[in-house]
Amino acid sequence: MNLKTRLFSIFLLATSSFVFAQQTDKIMLSGPDFEHPKTWDFKVSEGNNSGKWSIIEVPSQWELQGFGEYTYGRWYKELEQDEPSKEEGFYKLDFEMPASAKGQLVTIHFGGVMTDTEVKVNGEVVGPKHHGGFYEFEYDITEFLKFGEENILEVHVWKHSEIGSVNNAERKADWWLFGGIYRPVWLEVKPQTHIDHIAVDAQMDGSLKAVVDLVNPSEDLKILASLIPLEGNETFEVKTIDLTAETEQTIATQWSEVKLWDPENPNLYTLKLKLQKNGKTVHEVSERIGFRTLDFRKRDGIYLNGTKIVMKGINRHSFWPEGGRSTSKRISVMDVNLIKDMNMNAVRFHYPPDDHFLAACDSLGLFVLDELAGWQNGYDTKTGTQLVQEMVDRDVNHPSVIIWDQGNEGGWNYELDDDFQQHDPQNRIVIHPWSNYNGWDTHHYPTYLTGVHRFGSGENVFFPTEFMHGTYDNGIGAGLKDFWEHYSESPLFAGGFMWVYSDEAVLRTDWTGEEKFDSKGNLASDGVLGPHREKEGSFYTVKEVWAPVQFKPQAITETFDGSFLVTNAYLFTNLNTVKMNYRVMEAGAETMYNPNTKATVVTSGAIDLPHAVPGETRKITMPVAANFFKGDWLEITATDQHGREIYTWTWALHKADYFADKLIYQEAVKKSAKATQDENLVTLKSEKVTLKLNTKTGYIIEVNSQKRNIPFVNGPKPIGMKAEVEKVTLTQDGKNAVCRIDYNGGIDHITWTMYPDGRVHMEMIALKNAGRNSGFDGAFYEGDIDKFGITFDFPEEGVEGITLFGRGPYHTWRNRLQGIEYGIWEKEYNTTITGESFENMIYPEFKGFYANFLAGNLQAGDNSFKVFSESDKLFLRLFTPDEAQNGFRGSHFQPSFPPGNISFMYEIPGQRAFKPLSQQGPSSQPSNIRIKSGDDGISMKLWFDFRTDVDFK
């Protein structure tokens, strides 16, 4: 026995304080989680570090400890492998059992082992081999123990099951396949007569029913039931309940004035049951419970405590890059908080999660769909029957668990459906995720118009258990608003679950190169969060779309009186429990020139919210101070009753031309700017800046500023339209030099104006020259428009960052305009590939499209320049995000980008969500050009400042 294992044995003996008369004593043989492990002896049969005894941390996945071989579960599909890795693991641990435990019943418990498990104590097999990697199981080892002596625990683990249906259910799957003891191992010591298990049904009226399993009962037993609130100081009467000698019996009692559990108000109680004989406590157990009533009404909805619910949910894997499926309470609490931060109220899995995750869902408030594994194949009836019981027995008392899932996408066994109710006194429904089954339609990845007599056009309650697939930067937030609003029109809509919570990129202990984390290309890079919970842009989109406080769209103009229309989108909570505060922010005039200039608060305060029950819309009013319009944008932050930020909304207080006039620096210069033309070249020249245009193309071919050539060239090229130069006209407007270029095609004309101080103004008029009868000539635009504007070339090399005034800080898509807000955003250059740059994952990404662009200072050393928009609702295109390098054929990383590197656009493309854009909602679709004779055309006005010596002093 190695030193570390021996020390653990001594520690166990020295520190265990056994009180065997009443309570169950829990003795940890492993650590509680992978972040706090214990060390066991270990050997693996094949792969890395195989064939020799060493040590391993428990709990853990052995691959993450440097043993065996990594396998992804689509080994039989895209990965084209003949078979998965099939190594075996051998564990040993010496421990001492105190003599004082003799006469008690001792069981050993495994929280989860992948995949088949045989357990020996002192050389003897303690029970039948366990099959299935996601379930808690136990053995009675009393007869195998030596009390007061050293005992030897041996655990033989097969990564690949000997039962075909287990492999088909768990190991032919779209997830990583690991091996080992990855959840805790512990002993429980109980008196011979004891409460073995309870299954509780606690209703909203305070009534409680519990199925109690007893070991060695007798006629003269009673139970004393106590109820203790986790918060507050209420006291409840202790109830005395007579028992019979049956091993399974149902007890019932009731308390008045209990506080109910729901995800917005997750009130919890400790239920303490004391088993007494002749007035003496024989055994006692405690269970954390919540009082709530579930009502599943077909062709109507799902009700909690009498309220019809809508689940705003996401799917989640139990996963951490350095732990595989071995996680920790810290990670579980963090994950539930992040899910709640997105204003979600529900979560689903592909297998039973860690118990500490369910405990966090109970205490912080999430609905849970708890799933029997079976990715696309089900368990055989014999194996599945045992696993259903193990799953339900462990999870039945969690108030967060509201639905049982049997398998996924065909991975069910109809013979197991009734087994759930045999162990569940609450009679939760059993669904088959992705099927329209037994009155519940959970179809996966619906199109916007799904379907023929289903969803909004059908008669069954519907809640897609997977939708808005998030590969790379796809889905999740992109298109969510359309889908959600469309489905919400139906009274049969009960919610949905997006795929998926986080990228499943695992640390490869067997890799020696620069890459350290593996998501198997696009197969496991589906998260709204990175593997270490880095927030992608869709995180904030979901946060806004699913916020329980919703503002009616409104623009703030000079007539603004401080009022908004606000809807209470909670399920259970009154609007008046929400705290709301505002700030009016002002950008300094030097913002684009001095990186140290910070926005300042003009005025701030609180907004009183009225009484409004869920579903009601009310007018709210904020004070409008005399200096209100001195500010540039308004921020309103809502915080829920628990102190969690709901969202911060922003509104611009002025139009783009106001900001351009305010933010661009003007110098007094006596000398006039000049315009000259020489063959194919027009030169606009001021004292500091020279701009040269090609008269054949209309493109900038050179920008010179104080002996610096700034490579902002080869534009404006039209995007989404065609244009050819017709004529060039030079004029002098006072001290300003003017070049007007008229075009045939989509652009009517572009006017360039050089000011004496070096400022350059560009005004484009497009889509103007419609025919009187036939409308605009289609030869001059490119059909359906998903990209429209102008573009320029600019080298990416040397770019350091940008000071951006507009909506950010994340890039956006046509169908993902929520979750981005007005502000001054300092963005450092990065090359993050969304869902792939795991070694250097910097969010927000730098490259992409930015909405409501107002001003920017592009920092690129000697090539730096500034640009200001006089036009509202303009998108800035800032380079092109790098394509994912590791995706499999058929993956769709992003839509095509326009030519060039820096673009100014009125239309940008949408992002996919598993299905093609044509099957998404309205905001994902391309625009159509509509123009008639007499229209003014579309104007785009920009200011460029290529100067380097602007000094506000």
Language-model segments: residues:
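Substrate-binding/catalytic cleft of secreted carbohydrate-active enzymes
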Residues: 330, 336-339, 345-537, 541, ...
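Beta-strand-rich binding/interaction modules
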Residues: 121, 207-242, 249-251, 561-608, ...
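An acidic-aromatic loop/edge-strand motif
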Residues: 36, 61-64, 69, 73-78, ...
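Accessory carbohydrate-binding/adhesion or oligomerization-edge regions at the termini
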Residues: 22-77, 96, 156-165, 230-233, ...
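Beta-strand/loop-rich accessory regions of lumenal/periplasmic or secreted enzymes
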Residues: 112, 159, 262, 626-629, ...
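Active-site-adjacent substrate/metal-binding segments within catalytic domains
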Residues: 66-97, 101-110, 114-121, 127-130, ...
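Accessory beta-strand-rich segments of carbohydrate-active enzymes
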Residues: 24-26, 32-34, 40-47, 61, ...
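Substrate-binding clefts and catalytic carboxylate motifs of secreted carbohydrate-active enzymes
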Residues: 32-51, 56-57, 62-65, 86, ...
